[in-house]
């Protein structure tokens, strides 16, 4: 005797926030800050995480699509016209003025989001879905350890702005070139170590003088680098519940492939 398996329920499409760019700023040579808002802001489901992120939808202008996009129909009938999603940390969510700010790292003409940000101007449209996120600094943590590359600096900055002035710990960040190293005010009890590459980031974490007590750890960046850092944290016996750890990107992978690999062994960070 056989029975039919229950049909898999499709998740409803997330609401699309159709926003208008209101300001752009070249914060550093490789960082462009975009602020966007408007009536569509209310479609964003906000949260209190300091690492909150949104999915930004980029449609190929050659396809003549206008938002909101019927992603389900495009996926089924015209997959070649399907817009691309890119994940970005929200630098600031201004509920009162109904606008959000996102920092885009730009490296020439690479990718989709960076070139868009480089040419974006007030009046342009930005379509976003979200927000996600789960980390927020715990004021009761014995100390904090924040490990990041350039992609996670916006989340680190937001976390610092929410920390008590008496917070202690360490920030270790891989951001090449001094002109690109940007953080808000850091509590007096926290140290900041800047490095220029992933190997130096791993070494700095490995060589860190470990304080007493279990730290709350935020570690995000390139996938293989984060895997190496995870092994160090295991050696330090940091429990999983004290960790916010994941890859934001993978070297040699476009985001579409990177996101797909999250469900495969290569994409797992245990």
Residue ranges and their predicted role:
Residues 1-270:
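Extended, composition-driven regions rather than compact fold-specific motifs
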């Amino acid at each position: 005797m056989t029975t039919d398996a229950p049909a898999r329920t499709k998740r409803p499409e997330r609401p699309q926030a159709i926003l208008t760019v209101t300001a752009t700023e070249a914060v550093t040579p490789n960082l462009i800050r975009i602020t966007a808002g408007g009536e569509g802001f209310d479609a964003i489901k906000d949260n209190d995480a300091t690492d909150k992120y949104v999915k930004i939808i980029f449609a190929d202008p050659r396809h003549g699509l206008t938002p909101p996009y019927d992603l389900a129909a495009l996926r089924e009938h015209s997959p070649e016209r399907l817009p691309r999603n890119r994940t970005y940390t929200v630098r600031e969510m201004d509920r009162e003025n109904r606008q959000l700010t996102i920092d885009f790292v730009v490296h020439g003409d690479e990718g989709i989001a960076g070139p868009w940000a480089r040419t974006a101007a007030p009046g342009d449209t930005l379509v976003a879905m979200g927000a996600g996120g789960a980390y927020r600094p715990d004021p009761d943590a014995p100390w904090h350890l924040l490990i990041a590359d350039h992609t996670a600096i916006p989340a680190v900055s937001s976390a610092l702005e929410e920390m008590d002035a008496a917070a202690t710990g360490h920030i270790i960040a891989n951001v090449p070139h001094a002109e690109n190293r940007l953080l808000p005010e850091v509590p007096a009890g926290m140290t900041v170590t800047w490095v220029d590459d992933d190997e130096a980031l791993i070494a700095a974490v490995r060589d860190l003088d470990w304080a007493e007590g279990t730290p709350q750890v935020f570690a995000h960046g390139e996938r293989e680098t984060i895997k190496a850092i995870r092994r160090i944290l295991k050696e330090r016996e940091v429990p999983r519940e004290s960790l916010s750890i994941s890859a934001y990107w993978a070297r040699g992978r476009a985001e579409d492939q990177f996101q797909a690999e999250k469900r495969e062994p290569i994409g797992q960070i245990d």
